Amino acid sequence: MAVEEALLVVPARSDLLSLLRAVVADLAARRGFSYDAIDDLRNAVSEAATFLLGAGSAASRLELRIAPTPRGLDVDLSTDAPTEAWPPPGADRSLAWQVLSALTDEAVLVVDGATQGLHLVKRSAPAG
């Protein structure tokens, strides 16, 4: 079964991170990711969402977009918080950023109009 792009929009609350983690884990499993890669991606989404929620205290919603690629998954997380202070100073040297970089194949801070976000790439390897 082909995995289509998925979009999940939830209120910007930390108690909903488990829902984001479950969705990304399910889609990664359907794409044939190994258990370790699924766990890395699940933890990366949790870390990225926590990072965004901490930086955007004025956020009212958190958006997760997952798109399959020929080599894995592209994951975009964003909030509707004002972007004037995004990215936070030193964000690319923070512990959260180091964790994201270790768990994914690519992590990028994104500013796009009225949103602030993160773009993550996780390449798949056959489960086994």
Which residues does each PLM region occupy?
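Conserved beta-strand-loop-beta-strand hairpin that lines the nucleotide-binding pocket
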Residues: 1-7, 51-128
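Conserved ATP-binding N-box helix of the HATPase_c
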Residues: 35-59
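Bergerat-fold GHKL ATPase/HATPase_c domain
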Residues: 1-43
